[in-house]
Amino acid sequence: MERPDFFEFKNGEKAKLPFSSEEYNKRVNKLRSVMDTNNLDMVILTSMHNIAYYTGFIYCSFGRPYGCVVTKDKIVTISANIDASQPWRRSHCNNVIYTDWKRDNFLRAIVSIIGRDDPPKTIGIENDHVTLDIKEKLNSIFSIAIFKDISKHLMKQRMIKSDEEISIIKNGARIADLGAEEIVKHIKPGQSELEIAIAGRDKMEREIAKSYPDAEYMDTW
């Protein structure tokens, strides 16, 4: 029986993401500008927020590492086998799935994306997120590489909002107002805080689903 360290699985169709392909491409191009400025051959993203920002995929770790490799001509998410092809469907880029048959298959998947012929000499990582364990192993694998922290560069990029982001922020504020109004309606003597919170949350969740029918919601997958 073959037990692969990693593989690709493109099942289903690409899903509609929160932002357009043009928006994600602009973000990745800006990231590559940061790479050029800082002489980076590769970036390894590990945080949920940055992977979501540049690819559209939001992971749920449950103790497993997730990542995204960005080079001058590639962008690939790396996900655990438990998610199957969901990360591919819910991102605008390619995806590699690593298995649990061997320890550190996550790292083998990274190497598979960039190959062994021309190892990167400078690698950008998120020092405010990457674990000590992963960082030590990256140092061991890419022994000749210099690692640079790019977390602040990424944060500055995220701070400047596009028109598409502003639209979602405004809609989010509108939906939050609806939730607050529903909470006020349910505040009565003897009513539990839990039931009041449920009323506000349910109102917002239903409005979010109505406003974004193509999105994927908690406990629905």
Regions found by a protein language model. Name each.
Residues 19, 34-51, 130, 177-221:
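Active-site cores enriched in adjacent His and Asp/Glu residues with nearby glycine-rich loops
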